[in-house]
């Protein structure tokens, strides 16, 4: 076409040949049918817009087109979501850790029941990062296996630098969730086998291998749980024996549901056989399995605090970890207040009857290493020989107070006697180790408080004597020193009246306390003291006001007297001046000058009188009362 004349720069368009030129397609573009091509420059043809103007956005051309596009986009989105959910459906795994986080309110409630506090972030850190490093089988996602929880608790409660006292609340809460599981934990907890009663008459069976425990748990009661142990096979008795007596045989002991300071988390106790115990009925030996307790591992203590059942058989109950934790946190240290901690340990020794291993656990939890060594040393010093005096024989000391685990069977009378003697020596060691070096300044620093009774003050004074001096305040030889300290260090009002007592030397300490109680009880109450102070203040104000008024009246009276004298003096002087002036004035003639006393002119015409301007007349002064 370049060779055609007058066609350079021409634009070719398609002319539609449709019978309906105004009809549009689906997306707004006009349909292109067969046609012919003409030059734009032909003025006889109709001008058509370019195709770009026909193919505009679908949203501006047709509502149906917009509806179709939205439907396509929505279908694609639904298909994508369906594929994503179908791929991930069934892949969510619930772990003990995630389960506890989902029910965190219940976990906090369980911790509160154990008297401990926990934090969510610390909970996740210990479960996923800290406890898996103990190498006891703890998974990173947590577990409710009581055996694994027990091993972690042993690690946490280890004495010395290997222990983790800050993790005690968390492992105690884990153990509580596994021991008494909520409904959302029960599907993840292994079922517990029924507790097995060990009667005193049982034939011996091969012992089961003990659960492996780390060596550092040798001083603690066994914390292994029989949750995963299989029930032992029943041994058929002799067919010639009598049948079982179901009416007279005692049922197995159940766990005490009541709260106790020693069986809070204790597992099901096993009954220890008693030597020489007779059968409860002649038919017991028929169908009752005879067993001997399994051989204990050398690194695991199988002794627990003793408790006697209803049938005279001893059961063992472990110390509750929450009780140990509360005893440690709710009492001062042995160095700060040895008397209070000694009283606590004494009550535990008397009520729980702990074994040698339990005593070591108790000392390791409540005392530091140095305090424990000091207590053990003082206890060994308190061992007495056959003559009743402290002995120095190593054999006698080791027999009475051994440092290594002895072979004392608490099921025998001899073993229980050893344990009783051991507890007595341990208590004596606590009392002797609690005494501080002699410091009389500490004793003199004990003074009676403003509202403290004399009896309470005397108890504090005696406790200071026991703690800071080697003297016993209950000794009659020390009564005089205690009495003098009681008088001098009492409250000022009580001390002054006690010092003025007649025949003070013959008064005993009890007499002084009774006199001090009388003085203390006669003290005015705070209300009476306030009323007395108010009354004294009012009287003092009235007396001061009266004195001020009397002083003011006396001052006014004195001023009036002085003023009267002054006025009388002034008046008398003026009168005398008036009388004297009248007598001294000479008689003038009618032509005599009053100024120069010459005759022939008057005073106004006197040449000797000065003619200058007259000065101001002096003003008379007025006397006031202040002058």
Swiss-Prot record:
Membrane topology note: Single-pass membrane protein
Residues listed as glycosylation sites in the UniProt record: 113
Extracellular side: 87-627
Gene Ontology, cellular component aspect: host cell plasma membrane; membrane
Residues that span the membrane, as ranges: 64-86
Keyword Plastid tagged: no
InterPro entries reported for this sequence: G_retro_matrix, G_retro_matrix_sf, Gag_p12, Gag_P30, Retrov_capsid_N, Retroviral_Gag-Pol_poly, Retrovr_matrix, Znf_CCHC
Compositional bias (Basic and acidic residues): 523-555, 575-608
Region described as Disordered: 199-310, 523-627
UniProt keyword list: Glycoprotein, Host cell membrane, Host membrane, Membrane, Metal-binding, Transmembrane, Transmembrane helix, Zinc, Zinc-finger
GO terms of biological process kind: virion assembly
Entries under PROSITE patterns matching the protein: ZF_CCHC
GO MF: nucleic acid binding; zinc ion binding
Pfam families: Gag_MA, Gag_p12, Gag_p30, zf-CCHC
Compartments (UniProt record): Host cell membrane
Primary location recorded for the protein, binned into one broad class: host cell
PTM comment text: Glycosylated by host. Cleaved by host near the middle of the molecule, releasing the c-terminal half containing capsid and nucleoprotein domains op GAG.
Residue spans, zinc finger CCHC-type: 593-608
Function: Plays a role in viral particle release. Presumably acts by facilitating the fission of the virion bud at the cell surface. May prevent the antiviral activity of murine APOBEC3.
Official protein name in the record: Glyco-Gag protein
Phylogenetic lineage: Viruses, Riboviria, Pararnavirae, Artverviricota, Revtraviricetes
């Amino acid at each position: 076409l370049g060779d055609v004349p007058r066609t350079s720069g021409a634009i070719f368009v398609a002319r539609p040949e449709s019978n309906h030129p105004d009809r549009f397609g689906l997306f707004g573009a006009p349909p292109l049918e067969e046609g012919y091509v003409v030059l734009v420059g032909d003025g006889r043809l109709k001008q058509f817009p370019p195709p770009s103007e026909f193919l505009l956005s679908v949203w501006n051309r047709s509502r149906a087109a917009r509806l179709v596009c939205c439907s396509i986009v929505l279908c694609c989105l639904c298909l994508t979501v369906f594929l994503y959910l179908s791929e991930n459906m069934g892949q969510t795994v619930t772990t003990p850790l995630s389960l506890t986080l989902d029910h965190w309110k219940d976990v906090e409630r369980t911790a509160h029941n154990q008297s401990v506090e926990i934090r969510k972030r610390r909970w996740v850190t210990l479960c996923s990062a800290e406890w898996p490093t103990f190498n006891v089988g703890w998974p990173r996602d947590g577990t409710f296996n009581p055996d694994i929880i027990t091993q972690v608790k042993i690690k946490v409660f280890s004495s010395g630098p290997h222990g983790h006292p800050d993790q005690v609340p968390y492992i105690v809460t884990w153990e509580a969730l596994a021991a008494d599981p909520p409904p959302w934990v029960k599907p993840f907890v292994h079922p517990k086998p029924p507790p097995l009663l060990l009667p005193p008459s049982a034939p011996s069976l091969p012992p089961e291998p003990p659960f492996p425990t780390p060596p550092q748990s040798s001083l603690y009661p066994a914390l292994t749980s029989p949750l995963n142990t299989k029930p032992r096979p029943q041994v058929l008795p002799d067919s010639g024996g009598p049948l079982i007596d179901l009416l007279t045989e005692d049922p197995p002991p159940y766990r005490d549901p009541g709260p106790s300071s020693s069986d809070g988390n204790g597992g099901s106790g096993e009954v220890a056989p008693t030597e020489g115990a007779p059968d409860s009925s002649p038919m017991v030996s028929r169908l009752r399995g005879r067993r001997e307790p399994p051989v204990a591992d050398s690194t695991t203590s199988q002794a627990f605090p003793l408790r006697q059942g209803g049938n005279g058989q001893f059961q063992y109950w472990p110390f509750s970890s929450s009780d140990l934790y509360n005893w440690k946190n709710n009492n001062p240290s042995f160095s700060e207040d040895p008397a209070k901690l000694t009283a606590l340990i004494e009550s535990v020794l008397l009520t729980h009857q702990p074994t040698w291993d339990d005593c070591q656990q108790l000392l390791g939890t409540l005392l530091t290493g140095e305090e424990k060594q000091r207590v053990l040393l003082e206890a060994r010093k308190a061992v007495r020989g056959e003559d009743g005096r402290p002995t120095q024989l190593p054999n006698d000391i080791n027999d009475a107070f051994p440092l290594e685990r002895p072979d004392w069977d608490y099921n025998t009378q001899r073993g229980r006697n050893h344990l009783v003697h051991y507890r007595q020596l341990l208590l004596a060691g606590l009392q002797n180790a609690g005494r501080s070096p002699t410091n009389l300044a500490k004793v003199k620093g004990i003074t009676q408080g403003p509202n403290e009774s004399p009896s309470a003050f005397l108890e504090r004074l005696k406790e200071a004597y026991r703690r800071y001096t080697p003297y016993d305040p209950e000794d009659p030889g020390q009564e005089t020193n205690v009495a003098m300290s009681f008088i001098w260090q009492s409250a000022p009002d009580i001390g002054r009246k006690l010092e003025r007592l007649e025949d003070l030397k013959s008064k005993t300490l009890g007499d002084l306390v009774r006199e001090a109680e009388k003085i203390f009880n006669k003290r005015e109450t705070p209300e009476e003291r306030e009323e007395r102070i108010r009354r004294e203040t009012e009287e003092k104000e009235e007396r001061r006001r009266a004195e001020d008024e009397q002083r003011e009246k006396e001052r006014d009276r004195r001023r009036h007297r002085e003023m009267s004298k002054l006025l009388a003096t002034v008046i008398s002087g003026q009168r005398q001046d008036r009388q004297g002036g009248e007598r001294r004035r000479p008689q003038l003639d009618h032509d005599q000058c009053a100024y120069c006393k010459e005759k022939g002119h008057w005073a106004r015409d006197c040449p000797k009188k000065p003619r200058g301007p007259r000065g101001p007349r002096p003003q008379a002064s007025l006397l006031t009362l202040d002058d």
